[in-house]
Swiss-Prot record:
Molecular function via GO: rRNA binding; structural constituent of ribosome; tRNA binding
Family statement drawn from the similarity comment of this UniProt entry: Belongs to the universal ribosomal protein uL5 family.
NCBIfam families: PRK00010.1
Keyword terms: Ribonucleoprotein, Ribosomal protein, RNA-binding, rRNA-binding, tRNA-binding
One Gene Ontology biological process: translation
Known function: This is one of the proteins that bind and probably mediate the attachment of the 5S RNA into the large ribosomal subunit, where it forms part of the central protuberance. In the 70S ribosome it contacts protein S13 of the 30S subunit (bridge B1b), connecting the 2 subunits; this bridge is implicated in subunit movement. Contacts the P site tRNA; the 5S rRNA and some of its associated proteins might help stabilize positioning of ribosome-bound tRNAs.
PROSITE patterns: RIBOSOMAL_L5
Organism whose genome encodes this protein: Photobacterium profundum (strain SS9)
Entry-linked SUPFAM superfamilies: RL5-like
Record's protein name: Large ribosomal subunit protein uL5
């Protein structure tokens, strides 16, 4: 079992029950899933780029990504419906907690010129999204074998009803928000 999951059960739940005065511990917000998405628009011309992106995503997440396809044709971008244009991974359970722990303790501190994550990136329903400009902040990626630097989107989906509850949940894990 991941250390952060134990920490959530033993400490965070009690803190949030006291802070928001929940009547049941089932009302306490929890992290439901973490979604990683990598858009590879250049994959239209070079299929190898998408394969390399999928390999990077597999190393980062620990599971094989789903190749995303274009939903509709856009002449301006020279894409047609059904073209593979990216990959995504949805993490739940044990893998989610392992990834979340690595994200907070290892990857985020390795971001260049890091001054904290934007506290305004909540969506109004208690979910937090962030973008990473370089996949090389993750220790699983070998810097020498990277063909090109790619960014990815990370969305943390919580069961919180509001942004305030979600921010309290993530802050309890020492999530590095900007002051």
């Amino acid at each position: 079992m991941a250390k952060l999951h134990d920490y959530y059960k033993e400490t965070v739940v009690k803190e949030l029950v006291e802070k928001f005065e929940y009547k049941s511990i089932m009302q306490v917000p929890r992290i439901e899933k973490i979604t990683l998405n990598m858009g590879v628009g250049e994959a239209i011309n070079d299929k190898k780029l998408l394969e390399n992106a999928a390999a990077d995503m597999t190393a980062i997440a620990g599971q094989k990504p789903l190749i995303t396809k274009a939903r509709k044709s856009v002449a301006g971008f020279k894409i047609r419906e059904g073209y593979p244009i990216g990959c995504k991974v949805t993490l739940r359970g044990e893998r989610m907690w392992d990834f979340f722990e690595r994200l907070i303790s290892i990857a985020v501190p390795r971001i260049r010129d890091f001054r904290g994550l934007n506290p305004n990136s909540f969506d109004g329903r208690g979910n937090y999204s962030m973008g990473v400009r370089e996949q090389i902040i993750f220790p699983e990626i070998d810097y020498d074998k990277v063909d090109r630097v790619r960014g990815l989107d990370i969305t943390i989906t919580t069961s919180a009803a509001s942004d305030e509850e979600s921010k309290a949940l993530l802050s309890a894990f020492n999530f590095p928000f900007r002051k």
